[in-house]
Amino acid sequence: SPCLVGSEMCIRDSFNNVRVPKENILLGEGRGFEISQVRLGPGRIHHCMRSIGKAEKALELMVKRSGTRVAFGKPIAKLGKNIEVISRARIEINAMRLAVLQAAKAMDVLGNKEARVYVSAVKAMVPEKVCEIIDAAIQMHGATGISQWTPLATCLLYTSPSPRDTDLS
């Protein structure tokens, strides 16, 4: 059945009553997902690193905009909790970097299978936190944040949270 993912068309097939010869079964019956989890680790680390780069860009734009956008006669950096929002974004980016570094090191030292707990943790945490940071940057920009004048809306579209229930189980 066709589906639309982002701006690309994909095809999803489903099979009923399929028989797989015993010699073609990987790891054992019902363990196919397990082998894919082990092999997907490096790609997940890469995706998390790219997402953190988007959060870094959003923070950069947020800091710049908070000093130039004026409301009630003051830069918005001096209003409300905007400085706290910026500070929290910096802290969360640093925490994400350390968590991804820990996951990557675990893959190098322990191997992909044993590192899967670390990889699953960053795969669940990073996209969610990155979306929150990009959203905060959009809020600080006002309507400009969702326009084509900044990369923020596009970054948010391409940083979708993963199916966390799978990563956390």
List the model feature ranges, each with a label:
Residues 1-6, 11, 158-169:
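Single conserved hydrophobic/aromatic residue that forms the stacking wall/gate
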Residues 3-5, 11, 16, 33, ...:
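Residue-level marker of intrinsically disordered, low-complexity segments enriched
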Residues 8, 12-22, 80-83:
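A short glycine-rich beta-alpha junction/loop motif
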Residues 22-25, 168:
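Intrinsically disordered, low-complexity acidic/polar segments
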Residues 23, 30-33, 38-160, 164:
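Alpha-helical interface subdomain recognition
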